[in-house]
Amino acid sequence: MSSQPFTNKVIALTGSASGIGLETAKLLASRGARLSLADIQEDKLKELQAQLESEYYVDVITTKVDVRKFGEVEAWINKTIDNFGKLDGSANLAGVAPESIGLKGIVEQDLDEWEFVLGVNLTGTMNSLKAQLKVMANNGSIVNASSIRGLTGAAKNASYSSAKHGIIGLTRTAAKEVGGKGIRVNAICPGRISTPMLKTAENSIGLHLQPGSANYPPIALGRDGEAKEVAQLVAFLLSDESTYISGADISIDGGWRC
């Protein structure tokens, strides 16, 4: 396999400024992709752009986007087409966890928090798909970020789990709609991945799980995953090595659900 399998491929990413999105941007740049990066954190995007351009000599554009707002998402994708002339793939990785995760059940659910979490995670993914599929090249590929919580229930995690379940349904629906164009749409379902979002969630409840501790989840590999490991899966699904995979929800959880 070529060390630059994404040469001349244009890939759009949300959630690019941190965590899985950041590592995915780095990996794709190292493999020759031309990138259109979106995130709400504009300063971090600019820092990443400078790093990728200097280290990998690839074309990168960045856009501050609130994925809850379709107008902003559509403007970003239009900017991508204006700059690069096409869109070969996208990874919709923007996501948030609720501050009340692990603390409040459904009876105590705050409606503003519910709307925010579903807005970023689920509506944000729908907005991204809506804009991307209008211009996606035939035989393109899209990866959406679900979660292990999109496959299983979890007490005191209603908004996040509901959003991530919804992303799987949205992914399957999109795959059925655009398969005739050769466009593939898949969802990844990460487990415990060492990211800023995981740290923030654990800080909010004052609980820091360590491998080997009594309350650590039953993960077969006995450790948290790294964001760069998830990036490898995203890159695989965007690549020509996965041309018969579509409508799938693929776990990357170290053997948590097995």
Curated annotation (Swiss-Prot):
It is an enzyme of class 1 (oxidoreductase). It comes from the Eukaryota. The lineage of its organism: Eukaryota, Fungi, Dikarya, Ascomycota, Pezizomycotina. Induction: Constitutively expressed at a low level. Pathway: Hormone biosynthesis. GO terms for molecular function: oxidoreductase activity. The keyword Oxidoreductase applies. Disruption phenotype: Reduces the production of abscisic acid (ABA) and accumulates a compound that corresponds probably to 1',4'-trans-diol-ABA. It comes from Botryotinia fuckeliana (strain B05.10) (Noble rot fungus). Keywords: NADP, Oxidoreductase, Virulence. Short-chain dehydrogenase/reductase; part of the gene cluster that mediates the biosynthesis of abscisic acid (ABA), a phytohormone that acts antagonistically toward salicylic acid (SA), jasmonic acid (JA) and ethylene (ETH) signaling, to impede plant defense responses. The first step of the pathway catalyzes the reaction from farnesyl diphosphate to alpha-ionylideneethane performed by the alpha-ionylideneethane synthase aba3 via a three-step reaction mechanism involving 2 neutral intermediates, beta-farnesene and allofarnesene. PANTHER family: DEHYDROGENASES, SHORT CHAIN (PTHR24321), ESTRADIOL 17-BETA-DEHYDROGENASE 8-RELATED (PTHR24321:SF8). This is Short-chain dehydrogenase/reductase aba4. SUPFAM superfamilies: NAD(P)-binding Rossmann-fold domains (SSF51735).
